[in-house]
């Protein structure tokens, strides 16, 4: 089954062997769309969620055309975080495992926080593939230790995170050193307006491939919807965390400033809290990730973009401090829990202003929320969120009908409004009784 489905894309034998060992049964949705387009040499903007098979969607077809006899860089892959760059590099190692001895494909992982001089030494023999963070790759190119002028393909992974962390300028400088007929493959959960000038500069008529997020209502995730009711939201989150007693909980905020406010507020209330956002220095980020992996934190506050480039294991609870401004981020957030067969709880705190976004999540993403509130130490069922509005609707219809029957007189007298309202109320009561 594996061989049949992947061989239809004319992948070389070493890739088919690797796919078989990785136990891939059939190409995912994004892979089926990306493989033929990349093969044609077309530039691509790909949008898909975590866990969609995106990394292999771009690795398989680009590795397939590496010419091992040419000792020069043929493929550049940029990632916004060291952790993600390392993950991609490890996948390349797995996929090139079955190369013939005289056809070995070489790759280097070039990231900040490592000995740059040592990297320069290793680059005396240029690899076929470089994967790394934009800053380190750019530095090595500018120091003429790394030569990318013959590489026809560049992959920009998690592009919106690149933008958020200020790395797009570095990617721009790398791409500027590459051939004019460059194939650029950009992968991003969203395409922010500020990213578009960069895309326009390097991509002529790119293929836009968008895979809709999977239905996240399925599986083992319970979705709680909690009204803020003008309460102190940090107090509310604090109470939730104490009530849940999570293995590991992540609180998502929409901005870096808000992440700091929530983290500081929870720490003031006695919780030991980790934080992940784009303003952390590389050293602080590395330290934070080590602490998280060593289970030093039970609670983490994060922004969408900074957390997306990191694989955090064992998340039992996700709390949305507010619904995300982009609904695709909701999928990325809640998909971090209930992995590998485990169950999870995703809580979304909302204000009346969020009603429209919640409607979209229910209709477009098929989320089934439990409308609840934390009262004391117990969760109370609040019933349907839309109950009040649906109750009001018949009255609206009666008002319209009564206004048509009893019209405002052309010549008005004092107190006419009160008399008009009384007469219309009589009509509404009469009509209402008939309906019963």
Curated annotation (Swiss-Prot):
Pfam family, one: DEAD
Compositionally biased tracts (Basic residues): 405-419, 427-436
Keyword Magnesium (UniProt): no
SMART domains attached to this UniProt entry: DEXDc, HELICc
UniProt motif Q motif: location: 4-32
Main location as per UniProt: cytoplasm
UniProt motif DEAD box: location: 157-160
Residue spans crossing the bilayer: none
Function: Probable DEAD-box RNA helicase. May work in conjunction with the cold shock proteins to ensure proper initiation of transcription at low and optimal temperatures. Unwinds dsRNA in both 5'- and 3'-directions and shows RNA-dependent ATPase activity. Probably has a somewhat redundant function with CshA, as cshA can partially complement the growth effects of a cshB deletion.
Annotated protein name in UniProt: DEAD-box ATP-dependent RNA helicase CshB
């Amino acid at each position: 089954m594996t061989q049949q489905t992947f061989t239809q894309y004319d992948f070389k034998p070493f890739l088919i062997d690797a796919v078989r060992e990785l136990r891939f049964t059939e190409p995912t949705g994004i892979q089926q769309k990306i493989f033929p387009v990349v093969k044609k040499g077309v530039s691509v903007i790909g949008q898909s969620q975590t866990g969609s098979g995106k990394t292999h969607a771009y690795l398989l077809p680009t590795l397939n055309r590496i010419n091992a006899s040419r000792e020069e860089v043929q493929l550049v892959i940029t990632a916004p975080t060291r952790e993600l760059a390392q993950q991609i590099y490890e996948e390349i190692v797995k996929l090139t495992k079955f190369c013939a001895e005289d056809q070995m494909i070489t790759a280097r992982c070039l990231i900040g926080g490592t000995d740059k001089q040592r990297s320069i030494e290793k680059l005396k023999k240029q690899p076929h593939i470089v994967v790394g963070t934009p800053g380190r790759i750019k530095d090595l190119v500018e120091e003429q230790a790394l030569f990318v002028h013959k590489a026809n393909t560049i992959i920009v992974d998690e592009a919106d995170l690149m933008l958020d962390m200020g790395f797009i300028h570095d990617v721009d400088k790398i791409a500027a050193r590459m051939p004019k007929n460059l194939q650029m493959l950009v992968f991003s959960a969203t395409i922010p307006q500020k990213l578009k000038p960069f895309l326009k500069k390097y991509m002529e008529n790119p293929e836009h491939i968008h895979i809709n997020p999977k239905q996240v209502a399925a599986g083992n995730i319970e979705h709680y919807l909690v009204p803020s009711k003008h309460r102190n939201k940090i107090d509310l989150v604090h109470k939730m965390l104490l009530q849940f007693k999570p293995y590991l909980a992540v609180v998502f905020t929409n901005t870096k400033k808000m992440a700091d406010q929530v983290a500081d507020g929870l720490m003031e209330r006695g919780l030991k809290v980790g934080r992940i956002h784009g303003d952390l220095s590389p050293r602080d980020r590395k330290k934070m990730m080590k602490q998280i992996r060593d289970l030093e934190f039970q609670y983490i506050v994060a922004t969408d973009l900074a957390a997306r480039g990191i694989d955090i294991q064992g998340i039992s609870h996700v709390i949305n401090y507010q619904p995300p401004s982009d609904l695709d981020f909701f999928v990325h957030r809640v998909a971090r829990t209930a992995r590998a067969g485990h169950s999870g709880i995703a809580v979304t705190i909302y204000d009346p202003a969020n009603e429209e976004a919640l409607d979209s999540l229910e209709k477009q993403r098929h989320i089934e929320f439990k409308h609840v509130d934390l009262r004391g130490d117990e969760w109370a069922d609040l019933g349907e969120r839309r109950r009040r509005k649906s109750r009001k609707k018949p009255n609206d219809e009666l008002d319209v009908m009564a206004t048509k029957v009893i019209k405002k007189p052309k010549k008005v007298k004092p107190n006419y409004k009160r008399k008009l309202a009384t007469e219309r109320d009589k009509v509404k009561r009469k009509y209402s009784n008939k309906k019963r």
